[in-house]
Amino acid sequence: AASDVYKRQLLGGAHFWGYYPGKIWSQLICYLLLIPVKINGREKLHKRTSYVFVPNHQGSFDIFLIYGFLGRNFKWMMKKSLRKIPFVGKACESAGHIFVDRSSPKKVLATMRQAEASLKDGVSLVVFPEGARTFTGHMGYFKRGAFQLADELQLAVVPVTIDGSFEILPRTGKWIHRHRMILTIHEPIAPKGQGVENIKATMAEAYTAVESSLPEKFKGMVKNEDQDR
């Protein structure tokens, strides 16, 4: 009773503090740096539906673009190693973001259960399925984690294309360059069953959709040297 109310208050707090401060800060950064932002496809999403968003990972400014302009309350799913970063790891944990521990099937299952508890009433999940920023502007291969989670929870996967972040600050760059960013939200991919075949089909369809809105110069898969870590 009382403990359940307290838990709900904490959850509501995590939903607020884990999203809105980041959204406002991200919008402010883009406005202060005079970075134009264009959003395509928001009308494809239903307001109170939870999704698993899978964007490509062009650069550091991906975070500002998604936080500031996706227009959905969401949780990040991130690598367990990020939990060790001083202050950042604790802040992300307090905000209810989800760390993936792949050290055993039991830990993976625990991650899925945590996600299931968080993804209600339109709160969604954002995962970079490449697992690392690109060095070239091209997409690397997609890892299975986000798609396994969507399959387990029977949630629709939404492919998202980020374009322009690589030009602003590439992974090997030191200086910020003003450039327009475009966020393209593709049609949600509803589950077509459950299991390995659904996961494979969704991964392939999502990859094709994300790549379709990239400029020609960035089309074609180029594996990142640190994707397997």
Q: Would you name each region that the model predicts?
A:
Residues 33-40, 108-109, 165-167:
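Short gly/ser/thr-rich secondary-structure transition/capping motifs
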Residues 7-61, 65-68:
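N-terminal signal-anchor transmembrane helix
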